[in-house]
């Protein structure tokens, strides 16, 4: 059995997208890990899966998997690619879609130039909503001082459908994203692990950002990370509320807008890279894993 897939990216944040509306596949953790291997499989930052809706008021179910095989709640860049994919596959002809994720329902709107606006919902800042357990951690206003390998690190937290910690830095190019990001991602204060953003404020409508993604590592771009960083920046008075804020990442720029009390709106481009097919049984056999007899 061969399964069709599409490779896409949003600002360099790359995805493998599979239509499970018209195809059938048992996505085991082993298979996701193999598909995510850039040497032995296809390779991606996240695997996006389109499934039939589970409720009558949405168009599709949207599932997201990291390369380590874990299923995650949300992916903003992936949401934009999801919208373009279902239109290209003629699974829907709507310009505006409602899709269900593990963290709730989001709305996706595509313009005639192929840019997609995503209603990311309202940000959450309470520790219990991240989740974040700041026991014995110093808090000054909205900032937390977290002990990371004996060094205090000041950070802010937000949930944009998935958990984020954001550190304000003077220059993102000098930030120790790999070491510090990895240490904070798996810090005991974050029981479900956390995505870690490093934000530099350029002016009140422009930030530069690098993100160490949970279960992945640093990526070229992170949509939910940009939303979390801008929301925190607005909450702290560093950025203009209700205005377009440019979030500049390695892979390019997206536009984030947030008025406190309302949803965060994210707008950005998408790109198709190539299409292909793979054999689930073939991949599993090459890796020495017994295929699922029902796949």
Curated annotation (Swiss-Prot):
PROSITE patterns named among the record's database cross-references: DAP_EPIMERASE (PS01326)
Main subcellular localisation: cytoplasm
Superkingdom field: Bacteria
GTP-binding found in the keyword field: no
Keywords per UniProt: Amino-acid biosynthesis, Cytoplasm, Isomerase, Lysine biosynthesis
Its EC number(s): 5.1.1.7
Site residues (Could be important to modulate the pK values of the two catalytic cysteine residues), renumbered to this chain: 164, 213
Site (Important for dimerization): 274
GO biological processes: lysine biosynthetic process via diaminopimelate
Protein task: Catalyzes the stereoinversion of LL-2,6-diaminopimelate (L,L-DAP) to meso-diaminopimelate (meso-DAP), a precursor of L-lysine and an essential component of the bacterial peptidoglycan.
Protein's name according to its UniProt entry: Diaminopimelate epimerase
Native source species: Psychrobacter cryohalolentis (strain ATCC BAA-1226 / DSM 17306 / VKM B-2378 / K5)
UniProt gene name: dapF
């Amino acid at each position: 059995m061969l399964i069709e897939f599409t490779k896409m990216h949003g600002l360099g944040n790359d995805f493998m997208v599979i239509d499970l509306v018209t195809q059938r596949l048992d996505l085991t953790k082993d298979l996701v890990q193999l598909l995510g291997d850039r040497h032995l499989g296809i390779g991606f930052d996240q695997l996006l899966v389109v499934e039939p809706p589970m409720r009558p008021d949405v168009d599709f179910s949207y599932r997201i998997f990291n390369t380590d095989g874990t299923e995650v709640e949300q992916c903003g860049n992936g949401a934009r690619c999801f919208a373009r994919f279902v239109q290209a596959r003629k699974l829907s002809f709507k310009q505006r879609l409602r899709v269900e994720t593990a963290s709730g329902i989001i709305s996706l709107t595509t313009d005639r130039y192929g840019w997609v606006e995503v209603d990311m919902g309202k940000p959450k800042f309470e520790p219990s909503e991240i989740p974040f357990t700041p026991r014995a951690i110093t808090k000054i206003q909205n900032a937390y001082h977290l002990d990371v390998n004996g060094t205090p690190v000041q950070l802010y937290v937000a949930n944009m459908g998935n958990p984020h910690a954001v550190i304000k830095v003077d220059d993102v190019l000098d930030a120790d994203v790999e070491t510090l990001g990895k240490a904070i991602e798996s810090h005991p204060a974050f029981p479900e692990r956390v995505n870690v953003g490093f934000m530099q404020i350029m002016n009140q409508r422009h930030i530069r950002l690098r993100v160490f993604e949970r279960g992945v590592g640093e990526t070229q771009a992170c949509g939910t990370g940009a939303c979390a960083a801008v929301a925190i920046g607005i909450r702290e008075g560093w950025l203009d509320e209700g205005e377009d804020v440019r979030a500049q990442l390695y892979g390019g720029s997206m536009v984030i807008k947030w008025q406190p009390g309302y949803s965060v709106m994210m707008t950005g481009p998408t790109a198709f890279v190539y299409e292909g097919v793979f054999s689930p049984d073939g991949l599993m056999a090459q890796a020495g894993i017994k295929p699922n007899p029902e796949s």
